[in-house]
Amino acid sequence: MGMTKKALRIFIPVLVAVLLCTACTNVNSPRQERLLRQWQFTQDTTENPVWQEVTIPHDWAISGPFDRANDLQEVIVVQNGESEPSWKTGRSGGLPWMGKGHYHTRITVDTTKWNTLVFDGAMSHADVYVNGEEMVYWPYGYNTFDCYILPHLLQSDTVDIDVFLENKPQQSRWYPGAGLYRNVHLIATNWIHVPVFGVCVRTPEVNSDRAQVWMAVELQNGVDATSAEKENVTIQTDILYHGKTVATIDGQEGVAIVNKPHLWSPETPNLYYARTRVIQNGEVLDEVNTRFGIRSVSYTPENGFQLNGQTRKFKGVCNHHDLGPLGAAVHKDALRHQLAMLKEMGCDAVRTSHNMPAPELVELCDEMGIMMMIEPFDVWNHGKTENDYSVEFEDWWKADITNMVKQYRNNASVMLWSSGNEVWNQVLDDGIGIVTALQDLFHQLDPTRPVTNGMDQARYIIHNGFGAAVELPGLNYRTGRYEEAFEFLPQKMILGSETASTVSSRGVYKRPAVLKDFALYDDHQSSGYDLEYCQWSGLPEQDFQLQDDYNWTLGQFVWTGFDYLGEPSPYDTDAWPSHSSYFGIIDLASLPKDRYWLYRSQWQKNAPTLHLLPHWNWSEGDTVPVFCYTSYPSAELFVNGKSYGRLRHATPEETVRLAQGEVIKGVSPMPEVAEFTVPEWGSNPRPELLPRYRLMWFDVPFEAGTLEVVAYDEKGKKAASEIIRTAGQPHHLDLVWANKDEKPEELCYITVRVVDKEGNLCPNAANLIRFEGEGFIAAANGDAACLDSFVEPEMHAFAGQCTFIMRKGYKGTFTFE
């Protein structure tokens, strides 16, 4: 404790890294694993540092305070149409994540065992010492890595572990978090054992009658790779479904046949276990349980993306890794809550933008039926910020890809890999060579999945060879270039690797409701009418139309599922206090914005959608645009019982007529379009598409009372209705346990609503909500410009609501003023 870090650095890029996220042990197993949860932490660099007790996972920066000066960046953002540097405030969250940190723990180990430390992620530039000797250095904060506790260090069963971390200025263009923010494991095995990442499972042939399951098992003796023959051991793997053995494989490599397999899909996330045992003279030396799914995946120009022989399209979102008010510290209940909200919306896929995910996320996607695109990098060797991964790329890309692919190649939910996001190499001479080298390594490690790349420079990559070199081309935005890309790229398939980037603030509505890029307001909010976007982005309807009308599109990944810390576009240039994103379909407090129901109306096929906006608290004489997001074919709007007309969704043919200026009876008119802020970067927002996917009444006179929408089915019969009432003054708090049905292990998400005496939400309420008692963890309200601390038990309501994250069984009271 208080140990000074050695000046001499021993560089050990260990490739054999993590315990599979799907592996497990029991008390009778020769393999034992435990989480190392209790550590001491300091940022004090003096000879006698002051330590604090912390529980891992731990994000040292999330407690704040927020400050404009935290990672203030002077950069050029080309996507914004900039040619000169400008000050970017809040770009990485406005939290104090930069600097150095030191973690220490003392543990006991079994000195007769081979002991391995596994770090699921350490932010960043991790230097790990065991009993004063450096064991491993790993710079990339998102990847999993390991180190051995070498036998010569074990003079007793007591072991001191020290982890030194350093986050550098301009290391990230979003909030990276800080510290040991993912779990740390200790794995004890016999000297002869299956190394972590040592089991590979594939399902090369799959149909409803039978499936081939191929497996290969690595073996290790201490630090050395070895073989079953050399060690005089046998290896046996049983394939189990719900605890029952359905097939067996003998040896280090082999194939088993599973009859009548239960296939994995988002609708049926069936999972198998492979129980591998290493046996010597009748003694089980090691046992590893690897979870996997049986499914087939293919991508062809003829059939598009097929899962288990059925063509489908990704209905996906991109997500950053932070968990809002919890910061980057991983928590399974929080991840489960996010995925449950997305699945209820109809989402079936997640892209891990732009880094390796936490193992818990992949595990949950396997269990809950969420497909995944796993992406390691935001940059290659040409950076976007001064100290980003480009500094490490040349030395570390092989090790980082190797760890990532070996960690997640057995997971049923992983459908494809991405080699990078909007890398500058798209337009540089070295781009084709690098993307080819990366893809070759991916295929060497996993020949079963394709590799995509999120490309935003469409006007170049379509013709310069880069797009042709990407195995499965992904376009970020650039909806107006899809048809050109399909015509000229040889793959004849286009994936929407990143789409929309519509910006909005929950519960905030700007009038008039017009399509506008880079709209800025004095209150630092974006309109909840879902009509605003950045210069380089667009609206959901542009991507809906491409996916609906062209069979050569493979689906989309919307930017983003959840708001995240950092990147507060359009308030990103000297616009403090904005410090978190506006892109999310769901806000930073895990409260859905109106856009949630727009996507649900298109994606959720198991239940109808009917959603009305905005709120109905305006001033007498106001004219208010009213929108309805619905899966029903038509709906009628009423104010205090008076009809304002029945509208239906426009047909594809009618959108062409709308674009030509025609007014069509019974179809929503097109919204007006404001001038582009940066015309040369603006994409055509195609306002004629909106009446196809939403119903819009633009000139509804406000009268206090009720706003009602009535939906009609295909036969013209009333099918559903929704009512919004004018709210009175705040009267009391309404508490909703938002994640109760998810059966959380620890965390309760409590939605706190400020309501009037009749229970109607007060949509403009900004009261300060306080909790007094035990069990508080964090709070948030979804306001990207709010500087209330996440870790204090009080939070202002935003648009009448906020979220308190509590421990199960919390005791106390909520009050407001």
What are these regions (language model features)?
Residues Y299, A607-P625, S631-E636, A719-Y749, ...:
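Short S/T/G/P-enriched beta-strand
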Residues T22-A23:
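C-terminal motif of bacterial Sec signal peptides marking the signal peptidase cleavage site
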Residues R31-E33, G93-F197, G222-V223, H242-V246, ...:
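Accessory beta-strand-rich segments of carbohydrate-active enzymes
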Residues V27-N115, Q171, G177-L180, I192, ...:
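Extended carbohydrate-recognition surfaces in non-catalytic/accessory domains of CAZymes
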Residues M215-L219, R277, C628-T630, V710-A711, ...:
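Beta-strand-rich structural segments
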Residues A228-T237, E267-Y272, L637-A650, L658-E675, ...:
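Short flexible loop/turn segments that cap and initiate beta-strands
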Residues L154-S156, A216-T300, W697-D699, E703-G705, ...:
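Extended acidic/polar, glycine-enriched regions
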Residues E33, D59-R68, E74, E84, ...:
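Extended substrate-binding grooves/exosites of carbohydrate-active enzymes
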